[in-house]
């Protein structure tokens, strides 16, 4: 009787593992089936490491923690998937799986952008070795090498947007290689080294790495990335500039499992890179908006009624701004105190918004309504270069001290 109970218990455990699989929905290992394999793996740009396993297999159970570790460390760089062969016999048979676990690497052809025949992984079953093998398969030939001799050709050769990474590292990083796979044939990525001092100063390059996106072929109009150096943040910054984004209304094909989980350092940021901050003088404006694109919101705070309404507008702007972190800065100004800005930029009252590139002396006024859809559309159009920018001469003028309050009874 005792033996029967033990057998029943073991059978129950096997059934549970077979039903729910090794890898839960919270895992970074993506469960693959016949229904999603074609779309997820074969039709995608990303490289995939795929484990073919059986839930009762002892070696599979031993591999599981290492495979989970790989999926965490390579998140955003290489896709990590798994197929339960007890449930997906046809799919496993298609790849002639005869033992468990079997690891196969599905790489994208760097010339065609399509998947070829998978490669069997024959290395050690450790997280470090699997990761090393997977990262070595990332292509570097998607990235154009930019030097002092060809930088002008790179920037002006086409009117399409192009991203340029200014770096002092001798080799291309795995992160930038992975991004080049994500944007294969939809956004040109370049990497610049050993440029002269004059060129670096022209583009305000004061540290490495610095990532700029040039939105047309004038070689001068660019947007600077100021966010965290993670795959998900950089992807979110680059995606609106890609051809795919412009063609399908910003349809992000990389929403799932695109955040990098490993700890990274962050670039030093001004508070205005995260949310709207109030600007009260030219010095603070220069600190936040000296380079790149800056969204300037104008409010009249002279009455209590205005303040209450403006708070609602500001709350909306802070919500919308989360979609543009790393691509724009966010500031607001009380024009009841600094009353020169509205006429200086030929704006029609308040509340109002314009996007300014102070280093290039160009601005783009907002003409729509204060709504989530209208604001998002406007900011995306500015980033994509679809909105015409207006030249100006002088930076926004701030009063040296607050205007005196009117006498009140």
Swiss-Prot record:
Its main location: endoplasmic reticulum. GO terms for molecular function: protein disulfide isomerase activity; protein-disulfide reductase activity. Its EC number is 5.3.4.1. Residues 247-259 have a biased composition (Low complexity). Disulfide bonds join 57-60. It is an enzyme of class 5 (isomerase). Residues 260-273 have a biased composition (Basic and acidic residues). This is Putative protein disulfide-isomerase DDB_G0275025. InterPro entries: PDI_thioredoxin-like_dom, Thioredoxin-like_sf, Thioredoxin_CS, Thioredoxin_domain. Gene3D superfamilies: Glutaredoxin. It is found in: Endoplasmic reticulum lumen. One of its GO terms (cellular component) is endoplasmic reticulum lumen. Residues 1-21 form the signal peptide. Residues 28-140 form the Thioredoxin domain. It comes from the Eukaryota. It comes from Dictyostelium discoideum (Social amoeba). The keyword Endoplasmic reticulum applies. Residues 245-273 are annotated as: Disordered.
């Amino acid at each position: 009787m005792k033996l029967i109970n033990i057998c029943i218990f073991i059978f129950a455990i096997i059934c549970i593992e077979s039903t729910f699989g090794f890898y839960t929905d919270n895992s970074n290992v993506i469960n693959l089936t016949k229904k999603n394999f074609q779309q997820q793996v074969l039709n995608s740009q990303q490289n995939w490491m795929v484990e073919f396993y059986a839930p009762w297999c002892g070696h599979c159970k031993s591999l599981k923690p290492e495979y989970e570790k790989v999926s965490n460390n390579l998140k955003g760089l290489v896709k990590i998937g798994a197929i339960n062969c007890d449930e997906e016999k046809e799919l496993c048979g298609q790849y002639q799986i005869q033992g468990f676990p079997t690891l196969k690497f599905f790489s994208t052809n760097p010339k065609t952008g399509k998947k070829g025949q998978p490669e069997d992984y024959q290395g050690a079953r450790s997280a470090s070795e699997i990761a090393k093998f997977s990262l070595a398969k990332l292509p570097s030939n998607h990235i154009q090498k930019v030097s002092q001799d060809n930088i002008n050709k790179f920037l002006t050769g086409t009117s399409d947007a192009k991203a340029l990474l200014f770096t002092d590292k001798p080799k291309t990083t795995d992160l930038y290689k992975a991004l080049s796979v994500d944007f294969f044939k939809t956004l040109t990525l370049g990497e610049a080294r050993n440029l002269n001092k004059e060129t670096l100063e022209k583009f305000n390059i004061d540290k490495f790495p610095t990532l700029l996106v040039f939105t047309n072929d004038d070689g001068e109009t660019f947007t600077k990335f100021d966010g965290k150096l993670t795959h998900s943040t950089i992807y979110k910054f680059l995606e609106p500039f890609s051809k795919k984004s412009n063609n399908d209304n910003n349809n992000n094909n990389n929403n799932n499992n695109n955040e990098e989980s490993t700890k990274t350092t962050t670039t030093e940021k001004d508070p205005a890179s995260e949310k709207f901050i109030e600007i009260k003088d030219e010095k603070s404006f220069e600190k936040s908006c000296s380079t790149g694109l800056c969204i300037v919101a104008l409010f009249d705070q002279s009455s209590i009624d205005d303040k209450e309404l403006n708070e609602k507008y500001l709350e909306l702007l802070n919500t919308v701004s989360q979609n543009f972190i790393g691509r724009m800065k966010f500031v607001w100004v009380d024009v009841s105190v600094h009353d020169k800005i509205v006429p200086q930029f030929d704006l029609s009252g308040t509340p109002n918004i314009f996007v300014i590139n102070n280093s290039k002396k160009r601005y783009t006024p907002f003409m729509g309504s204060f709504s989530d859809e209208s604001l998002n559309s406007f900011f995306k159009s500015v980033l994509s270069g679809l909105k015409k920018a207006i030249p100006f001469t002088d930076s926004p003028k701030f009063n040296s001290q607050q205007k005196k309050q009117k006498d009140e009874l």
